[in-house]
């Protein structure tokens, strides 16, 4: 299974795409549990053992029992790992190799393993624990970026050149008190790439990530890579995943590459079988409530359209005494006071109150609230929804985007909006 942080993570789309492409089950923390020293997946058919866990969750958030900084995770996971009952891809602690300190020793590491000199030089890095490096950093503080020597969470780099004199003195005091905890790296001028930023093309700094595959036969550098871009270079210095957007890097070739598909890597007939009971129980529950809220939103939209059409045909008097208005109130689409004699006179007229109710957050059972639930639930089911379904939900969200009070639609615009949604 592929263990993701969930729809709130900026990497969730990549996690869902990866799981769907490879045919693996995408799970969140609530889908997993430890029973009898075995990692289990909660499904409709009961608990199923998990043998391989592809971890996409930070180390410190994996096990709240043993990792005291964890606010989530699967209780007992580390004990299962020590017992050898589960294999974890992207093993715990592998984040250590992203520590800036290793850049100091990369040339010597390559020499030790007889790999030859580095083909690409590393960014000049100085460890403040070394006396000569410490004095050089102190003398050139305005030319470097200060980072923690060991990667501990997403700690932002420090830029002495942008600090006040007092802030710079405080930083020097921190480095002097714990020199082994800091490294300094030379500031570099990053290349830029064109980025479409909403309504125009801008040049943003980029950070390029390459990938190397290791096997028994050696290592192979993959063509292309991944670029992270941001509107200012400082946003790219924090970690390999920092930045605001991702861009694929393609190498232009002279001939078409052969098609590859992980799903069709094996030949032979496909055996069809029903496996509904292996569906994670969280997914089944989310699908149930997704369907319920889609039905509720559609019912509210159709009922509201009938009411707006009566207003559009100048039949407000008929609407006030009709069952349509009562049905809207009883289903939570409008304020109940609109049908209470003696109170509706104190409220805005129907021509303004009905269109406003479409975008109201104050109605728990209203159209906007139901649509919010649809968007939230579908985000957690991204790996199981078709592309067409996802486009429809995105279109609904875009059409019904929240608006300021001064920009609310009138009766005609609201009717047209509901026509587009229902059709």
Residue ranges and their predicted role:
Residues 1-244, 248-261, 281, 305:
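Domain-scale recognition of functional cores that engage charged ligands
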Residues 11, 15, 104-107, 200-203, ...:
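Alpha-helical transmembrane segments and their helix-helix packing motifs
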């Amino acid at each position: 299974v592929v263990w993701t942080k969930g729809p709130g993570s900026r990497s969730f789309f990549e996690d869902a795409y990866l799981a769907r492409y490879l045919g693996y089950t995408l799970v969140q923390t609530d889908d997993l549990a430890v029973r009898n020293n075995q990692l289990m997946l909660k499904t409709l058919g009961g608990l199923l053992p998990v043998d391989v866990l592809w971890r996409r969750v930070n180390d410190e958030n994996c096990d709240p029992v043993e990792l005291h900084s964890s606010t989530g995770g699967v209780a007992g996971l580390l004990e299962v790992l020590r017992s050898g009952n589960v294999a974890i891809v992207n093993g715990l602690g592998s984040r250590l190799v992203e520590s800036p300190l290793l850049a100091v020793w990369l040339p010597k590491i390559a020499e030790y393993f007889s790999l030859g000199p580095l083909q690409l030089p590393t960014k000049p890095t100085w460890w403040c624990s070394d006396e000569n490096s410490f004095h050089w950093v102190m003398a050139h503080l305005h030319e470097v970026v200060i980072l923690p020597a060991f990667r501990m969470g997403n700690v932002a780099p420090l830029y002495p050149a942008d600090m006040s004199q007092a802030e710079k003195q405080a930083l020097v005091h921190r480095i002097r008190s714990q020199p082994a905890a800091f490294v300094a790296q030379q500031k570099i001028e990053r290349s830029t790439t064109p980025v479409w930023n909403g309504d125009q093309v801008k040049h943003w700094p980029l950070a390029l990530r390459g990938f190397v595959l290791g096997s028994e036969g050696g290592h192979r550098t993959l063509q292309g890579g991944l670029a992270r871009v941001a509107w200012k270079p400082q946003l790219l210095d924090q970690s390999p995943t920092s930045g605001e957007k991702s861009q694929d890097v393609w190498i232009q070739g002279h001939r078409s590459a052969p098609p590859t598909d992980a799903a069709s890597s094996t030949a032979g007939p496909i055996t069809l079988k029903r496996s509904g009971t292996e569906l994670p129980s969280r997914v089944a529950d989310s699908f149930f409530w997704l369907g319920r809220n889609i039905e509720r939103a559609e019912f509210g939209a159709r009922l509201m359209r009938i009411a707006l059409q009566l207003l559009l045909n100048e039949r407000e008097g008929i609407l006030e005494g009709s069952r349509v208005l009562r049905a809207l109130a009883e289903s939570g689409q409008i304020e109940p006071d609109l049908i209470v004699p003696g109170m509706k006179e104190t409220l805005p007229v129907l021509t303004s109150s009905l269109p406003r109710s479409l975008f109201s957050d104050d109605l728990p059972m209203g159209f906007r609230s139901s649509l919010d639930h649809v968007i939230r639930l579908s985000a957690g089911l991204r790996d199981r929804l078709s592309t067409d379904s996802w486009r429809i939900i995105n279109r609904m969200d875009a059409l019904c985007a929240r608006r300021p009070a001064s920009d609310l639609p009138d009766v005609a615009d609201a009717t047209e909006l509901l026509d587009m949604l229902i059709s």
